[in-house]
Amino acid sequence: MEVERVIEVYLAREGIYIPEERLGTMVLELKSWLKPSLEGSGIMKTQEGDFTLIHSHYGEPYHSLSAGAIRECLEKFFNPSGLLEKVQSLKRINILDIGFGLGYNVAVAIKKLKEINPLIEIEIISLEKEVPAQIPPMPKEFRSIHKNILEKLPSFEEDGVSFKLYLGDARESIKKIKDFEAHAVFHDGFSPYRNPELWSLDFLKEIKRLMHKEGVWVSYTSSLPVRKALKELGFSLS
C-alpha cells in the first residue's frame, strides 16, 4: 500500500484532520526517512517559505520542513544558547558549531550578535564531514552574510569575526582543537538514529572539553540516550 494511502487511512480512523499542504510535507518526510536512497536529495521549501536540503545519505532534511529553517535556527539554537545575554557583557563570544550543514546557524548567529553589539568579537569553529555542492540562499535578512561565509570557506577573519571550518570526520577533527572555550555549542548533526557517532559519550566528552565553564550546549534532539550521556558528563539539563 502507498505511504499516502496508509496515512490517509490512519488519520480517518483516528478522526484527525490535517491540511493537504501539511499532509504532503508529512508524506515527504516519512518517505525520505524510510527510503533515503530511493527518494534522493534536493532543495525543499519549508512550511515557513524558506529553503533547506534533503541529505542523500541520511535521508533527513537539514532543517525542519514544518517549523522552517530560520525559525529552527532561532528557536532551537540561537535563542536558547544564552548568547543574547552574553553579547551585552562580553567582549568576545566563542561558538562551537557541530554540523555546519548549510551554514544557516553560523549566519544567524553572526547577524544577530552584531546587531546587538557591533563591536563584539566572534570566533566560530565549525565541524562538517562535507559541505553540499548546492546550498539554497537564505532569506534576504541573512543573505549577504551567508553568501560571504560560503564564498570564503573554509576560513576567514574580518570585521571582528574569525571563522574556521574543519572538514572530515568530526570525531577526529574535534581532537585537533586546542585552547578554545565555547560560550555556546550548536550541536546540529543529523539524528542520533541516523548519525549516532556524533552523539556518543566519547564525542560529547570532547565537546565538554572545549566548553567555557558557563557555556551552554543546545540541540534539537530530546533523545533519551543523549540526555543520559549528558547527565553522566555533569551537564545540567533544561
Residue ranges of each PLM-predicted region?
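C-terminal substrate-binding/active-site "lid" region of AdoMet-derived donor-dependent transferases
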Residues: 195-238
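Cell-envelope and extracellular/periplasmic
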Residues: 188-190
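A generic structural signal for short coil/turn motifs at secondary-structure boundaries
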Residues: 61-64, 175, 193-196
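Short, well-ordered alpha-helix to beta-strand connector turns
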Residues: 181-182, 214
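The AdoMet/dcAdoMet-binding core of the Class I SAM-like
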Residues: 2-16, 22, 26, 83-180, ...
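S-adenosyl-L-methionine
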Residues: 2-96, 199
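Short alpha-helical
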Residues: 69, 104, 172, 224-225
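Glycine-/small-residue-rich active-site loops that bind phosphorylated ligands and cofactors
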Residues: 101, 192, 218
